[in-house]
Amino acid sequence: MKNVFLTGGSGFLGKYIIEELISNGYKVFALSRSETSNKVLSQMGATPVMSSLHDEQGLTEAIKGCDIVIHCAAKLETNSESVQELYKDNIDATELLFNICNQSSTSSVSVFCFISSEGVIMNGENINNATEDTPYPPIEQLGWYNKSKAISEQFLLATQSSMSRMKTIVIRLPLVWGSRDNVLDYLVGLCNKFQWFWIGGGKNYLSIVHAKNASYGIRLAIEKGDNQDIFHLTDGESVQYRKFFTDRFKKKGVSTNKLHMVLPTPIALSLVWIMALIWKLFNLKGLPLLTKTGLIYSSKNFTINDDKARLKLGYTNKINYNQGMDEL
């Protein structure tokens, strides 16, 4: 039995990763920062480890005896108090955890798996069927969250030599969906208050990955991936943005009468810059409701290719689109 240390275990995707690992014979130690998380993690069969992503001593103790580390925890634009907080939790914490794991004299970790985002290649234009070899755009073109992931990826891959004792593997995920998604519940609330708009009509296409498929692919990657491998994981076929969100909203009981409002893209772009300026001038807490990242996701094609994972890892879908919708 191999021991896995997991960050972000009490989050939406983290819970699916725990289920996938435990059902396949792994013992999971999951980072926890509260008694509430302790209870959730314990109920799922994981062993909670009280510490913080910024506690070097605590993390050093947490990974002792672990063969694999999966770093899934991340701060999103929607739940960050500031850009500085987002960068601290996503960049600084990643570098700290990686450096602790990479200490050959004290660490038993042989695989470091970083859960990243397709957004690291988001350049503001339509992107269709992008592979893992697609180059990063200039860093200033990326939104805050995607920039934090791109910086972390580049640090990990540049630091880790091909001859290193520890394998570093990067998983790039598109929009992750499935049951138990609190973000979907929040969006449903916006719909019911007539606050949901289709930017540009919502006719763009995107890649998605169900949390069950993502967690399965992550397990395959830690078992079969090589050092410095990057893998895209998707549900296969891309889906139109408007159809995907409408299907989910309807499953949650949202009336189609509340899903007809359209916001022209030029107006949405103006709002992004106006909001950013207001937040900066008045030093408002949190990040703007509409950001550059959100605008691009909502209005541009963004599809990625996961042939590498399917060919090298034997990755396939454990659940299809209709089955996933039926579970909502």
Swiss-Prot record:
Residue positions binding NAD(+): 149
Active site per the UniProt annotation: 145 (proton acceptor)
Membrane disposition: Single-pass membrane protein
Chief localization: endoplasmic reticulum
TM helices/strands, residue ranges: 259-279
CDD domains: MupV_like_SDR_e
Signal peptide start and end residues: none
Compartments in which it is found: Endoplasmic reticulum membrane; Lipid droplet
Gene Ontology MF terms: 3-beta-hydroxysteroid dehydrogenase (NAD+)/C4-decarboxylase activity; dTDP-glucose 4,6-dehydratase activity
EC number: 1.1.1.170
Keyword Membrane in record: yes
Pathway(s): Steroid biosynthesis; zymosterol biosynthesis; zymosterol from lanosterol: step 4/6
Subunit structure: Homodimer.
Family: Belongs to the 3-beta-HSD family.
Main function: Catalyzes the NAD(P)(+)-dependent oxidative decarboxylation of the C4 methyl groups of 4-alpha-carboxysterols in post-squalene cholesterol biosynthesis.
Name of the protein this chain belongs to: Sterol-4-alpha-carboxylate 3-dehydrogenase, decarboxylating
Source organism of this protein record: Dictyostelium discoideum (Social amoeba)
Name of encoding gene: nsdhl
